[in-house]
């Protein structure tokens, strides 16, 4: 028995880059694909919103001396490349019911995102990979991940982070004493200025009550465990009372957990 029937997985470009940090890492790609397959085999319907930061980021426009909208267009096309690569790896591992849908038309390699068709594909057991965010500039793929989850009637967003196992009260890479939150409300995340995702994504999730799970994609089986109802990382929802199984306690810091 699973807790969730349908989820949207937010997959960053950095997760695809793995140890390479830029471009692609074959081991990271295979790990991601196998984790997705495991969730599908548990009976959960899966849509994936793919980022493109391993190839290009729209906020690099000043560095390249180009217009921000043009830079965001390049970033959106980067998500198409990552989506095709992920589809290719899933296919190589035996998955055959896959679709790549794009918010910006790229008809030679993918089909356009049409909400009702995406819902139909999910109901028929397809894994739907969503590229180009929502087709608009000045956004990362965080906001579109929540938007697509709402449009597709998903039960939750699973935000896969590379090497970060949840939301901390400060940057654990800088502060060894940073403490991991088990649960936070949307308003707590916004008021504390916690930047694990864009605030616009938190606001949209709050306004429509979409649960968010922030977890480390490097932890094998974490996505499947979350869908089964087990706790991994940090859950962000309306209030602690609505997620009593998690509470809003602060867990041990990385230094304490390894002591």
From Swiss-Prot:
EC numbers for this chain: 2.7.4.22
Record keyword Transferase present: yes
Disordered: annotated segments: 236-259
Known regulation of activity: Inhibited by UTP.
Keywords from the UniProt entry: ATP-binding, Cytoplasm, Kinase, Nucleotide-binding, Pyrimidine biosynthesis, Transferase
GO BP terms: 'de novo' CTP biosynthetic process; UDP biosynthetic process
InterPro entries assigned to the protein according to its UniProt record, in alphabetical order: AceGlu_kinase-like_sf, Asp/Glu/Uridylate_kinase, Uridylate_kinase, Uridylate_kinase_bac
Pathway membership: Pyrimidine metabolism; CTP biosynthesis via de novo pathway; UDP from UMP (UMPK route): step 1/1
Subunit structure: Homohexamer.
Protein name: Uridylate kinase
Organism: Frankia casuarinae (strain DSM 45818 / CECT 9043 / HFP020203 / CcI3)
């Amino acid at each position: 028995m699973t807790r969730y029937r349908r989820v949207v997985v937010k997959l960053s470009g950095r997760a695809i880059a793995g140890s390479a940090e830029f471009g692609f890492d074959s081991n990271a790609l295979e790990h991601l694909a196998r984790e997705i397959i495991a969730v599908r085999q548990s009976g959960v319907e899966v849509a994936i919103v793919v980022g493109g930061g391993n190839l290009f980021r729209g906020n690099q426009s000043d560095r390249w001396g180009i217009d921000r909208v043009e830079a965001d267009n390049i970033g959106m096309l980067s998500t198409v490349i990552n989506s095709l690569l992920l589809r290719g790896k899933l296919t190589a591992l035996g998955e055959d019911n896959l679709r790549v849908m794009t918010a910006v038309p790229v008809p030679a390699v993918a089909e356009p995102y049409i909400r009702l068709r995406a819902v139909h594909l999910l109901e028929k057991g397809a894994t739907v990979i969503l590229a180009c965010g929502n087709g608009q500039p000045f956004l990362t793929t965080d906001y579109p991940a929540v938007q697509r989850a709402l449009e597709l009637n998903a039960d939750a967003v699973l935000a896969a982070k590379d090497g970060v196992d949840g939301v901390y009260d400060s940057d654990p890479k800088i502060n060894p004493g940073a403490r991991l939150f088990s649960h936070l409300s949307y308003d707590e995340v916004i008021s504390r200025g916690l930047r694990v995702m864009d605030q616009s994504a938190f606001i949209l999730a709050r306004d429509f009550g979409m649960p968010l799970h922030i977890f480390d994609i490097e932890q094998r089986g974490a996505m499947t465990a979350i869908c089964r109802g087990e706790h991994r990382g940090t859950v962000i929802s309306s209030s602690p009372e609505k997620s009593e199984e998690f509470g809003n306690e602060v867990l041990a810091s990385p230094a304490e957990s390894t002591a």
